[in-house]
Each structure stands twice: as structure tokens, then as C-alpha cells.
Amino acid sequence: MKYPLILASSSLFRQSLLQKFNLPFDTFSPNVDESALNNETPAQLVKRLSELKARAASKHFSKGLVIGSDQVAVFNEQILGKPHNKHNAVKQLSLFSGHSVTFLTGLCVYDLTSGESKTCIEPFNVTFKTLTDAQISAYCDAEQPYNCAGSFKSEGLGICLFEKLTGDDPNSLIGLPLIKLSQLLAEFGLDVLSAQSNTPLS
């Protein structure tokens, strides 16, 4: 393939999504500080971090198209990060119960050869059911979504937390908006469909 693909993420969920393109790719885990800067908006944060993650590939690779992605949950104009433990996950889900939450996913494609990058932000809205304390606790014990923005895994049992999903690409909720990604790759000359002629279908 003319452009090797590199995913700047150790997330198995993002890797699984990228496999839908049926193209070979490498992965690496970018080591970046994900803390928000002073007065940084949620959109600015995910844009900056997706770019930082993609550009970190220059330490490991010399050529290729690097895909960087970052996601935050926004509720009442506040950024909610990963919960890291059950206490914080229960607290987040209790806040979300009966309300809508916006998830912003920053996506960056960075060309290691030219240094050019293209970035976009994909919003997705989730309306939660009214949940009981017992339901929230049972969900957290079952799926332990402590490293996930929003304290859930929508690709698993987390789907049962929702009343409604609104957005252009449900893949963005898992962390990698594939529709936008295919468009950005095409802008760099990599058409995912045309590239299938060199890639056996699995």
C-alpha cells in the first residue's frame, strides 16, 4: 500500500473499528499529557490532543499516515474525563441519569512524510434512561468502564443505559469516527474502497 497506516492508540476498541477498513495498520501507544489547558474549551482540547497523539508517531515511524483520536464527555458545559474507579463512574452515571450528554471526538490524520495534518471534531449526543442506583452499580460491576469517557462502553452492555442516540456516526461514540476518517484519508490520496484491490477481503 502506498501509505502505511498507523493508529496512535492502544485501545482495542479503536483497533477493532479500524479493522473494518480491511487495511493493514500498525499501532503504538502515544504518551501525552491529556490534561486540559487553562480556559481550553472541550472542542479545543480534543482537537489538540488528537493532533499531539498523531504527531507523537514521529518518534517511532518515518513514514505513513498516522491516525490520532481523543474523546471527552461534556455535561452542563463541564468536561468529564475518564472515571478511573467505580466511585467516580457511579457519580458520573448518576449525573447523566435522565439527561443528555455530548461526546466530542477529535480526529487527526498526520502525514509523517510531508508534515501535513487534517483535523476534525465529531459530536455525538447520548440521552440516558432514568437509572436507579442499583442499575448503575450493577452496570459498573459488570463492565468496569473505568477507562472510558462517560463511564460506559456503548459497544457492550452500556447500550442498555441509553434512551436515544443522536449523531452522524455511531462509531464516534466508541472513539473513532470512521465516516470522517475515510474522508480525511481520501484527502491524502488513500481511498479505502479503491485500496481493497490490493487487500484480500477477510
UniProtKB/Swiss-Prot annotation:
Cited function: Nucleoside triphosphate pyrophosphatase that hydrolyzes 7-methyl-GTP (m(7)GTP). May have a dual role in cell division arrest and in preventing the incorporation of modified nucleotides into cellular nucleic acids.
Entry EC number(s): 3.6.1.-
InterPro entries: ITPase-like_fam, Maf-like
Any one GO molecular-function label of the UniProt entry: nucleoside triphosphate diphosphatase activity
Hydrolase is among the record's keywords: yes
Family to which this protein belongs: Belongs to the Maf family. YceF subfamily.
Protein's name in the database: 7-methyl-GTP pyrophosphatase
Cellular compartments annotated: Cytoplasm
GO terms for cellular component: cytoplasm
Pfam families reported in the protein's UniProt record: Maf (PF02545)
Cofactor (UniProt): a divalent metal cation
Reaction equations catalysed: N(7)-methyl-GTP + H2O = N(7)-methyl-GMP + diphosphate + H(+)
UniProt-annotated catalytic positions: 70
GO biological process, alphabetically ordered: nucleotide metabolic process
Species: Pseudoalteromonas translucida (strain TAC 125)
Cystine crosslinks: none
The organism's place on the tree of life at top rank: Bacteria
Site (Important for substrate specificity): 13, 71, 155
Keywords: Cytoplasm, Hydrolase, Nucleotide metabolism
